[in-house]
């Protein structure tokens, strides 16, 4: 037994609900889930409407939120650690408004934290907003399919080419509507639910600037929060280093 195994066993069993982001499905969490289960935790990975095997892309943010709320309540989950990655951050913000009494802690992993009245696309510089919206306009069903070279350089910048291609091949076009909707988050900002922010330093999906970026720009909106930092990019680290990510999640989630 190495020191990391001892470290894991010092932490009580937790119930994790892992909410994936755009262009992926629950398989994004596969390696991390395996590591968390090995540590003795309980893990749930709901699939968001309009993602993965769900071919109906005509969804909005409310539909997605309702599905996660239904998943948690129908499975009678309580005292959960609710984790959102990327777009999943906006989902857990809205879920927390309805289920704050079931949530022990919110964890945002390089996740969007929106101000009241903002959309996800509002978090990007104007040039990037136009790029994404033009892709949606060019599609037949208001979805966004990222070009491979953009995905390779921005989303999986630390991966080798073979890994980048494997991850890209598993992506599906992203419904655009939930990304452009401006969300009412007044209730979220009245909550006192403990929260954490995990920041991977090489994640470049949202350019870091005076008025943009994961950390400190979006993370600071959480008020008082636990900050956990690691090394990794937006999508390949979950696949290549799942044990590392599981440990960061445990650090972010512990009492």
Language model features: what each stretch is:
Residues 17-21, 85, 199-200:
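The conserved beta1-alpha1 loop
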Residues 11-53:
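Conserved HGGG/HGGXW glycine-rich cap/lid loop of the alpha/beta-hydrolase fold
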């Amino acid at each position: 037994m190495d020191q990391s195994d001892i470290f894991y066993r010092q932490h009580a069993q937790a119930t994790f609900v892992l909410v994936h982001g755009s262009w992926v499905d629950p398989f994004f969490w596969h390696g991390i889930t395996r590591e968390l289960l090995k540590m003795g935790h309980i893990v749930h990975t709901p699939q968001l409407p309009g993602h993965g095997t769900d071919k109906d892309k005509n969804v909005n943010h409310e539909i997605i939120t309702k599905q996660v709320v239904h998943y948690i309540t129908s499975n009678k989950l309580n005292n959960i650690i609710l984790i959102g990655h990327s777009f999943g951050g906006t989902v857990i913000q809205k879920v927390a408004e309805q289920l704050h009494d079931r949530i022990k802690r919110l964890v945002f992993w390089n996740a969007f934290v929106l101000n009241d009245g903002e959309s996800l696309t509002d978090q990007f510089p104007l040039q990037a907003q136009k790029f994404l919206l033009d892709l949606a306009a060019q599609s037949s069903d208001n979805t966004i399919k990222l070009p491979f070279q953009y995905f390779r350089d921005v989303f999986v910048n630390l991966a080798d080419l073979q890994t980048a291609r494997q991850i890209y091949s598993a992506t599906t076009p992203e419904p655009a509507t939930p990304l452009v909707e401006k969300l009412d988050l007044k209730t979220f900002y009245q909550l006192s639910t403990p929260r954490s922010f995990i920041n991977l330093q090489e994640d470049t999906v949202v350019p870091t600037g005076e008025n943009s970026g994961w950390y400190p720009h979006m993370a600071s909106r959480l008020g008082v929060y636990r900050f956990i930092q690691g090394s990794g990019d937006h999508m390949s680290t979950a696949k290549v280093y799942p044990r590392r990510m599981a440990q960061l999640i445990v650090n972010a989630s512990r009492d």
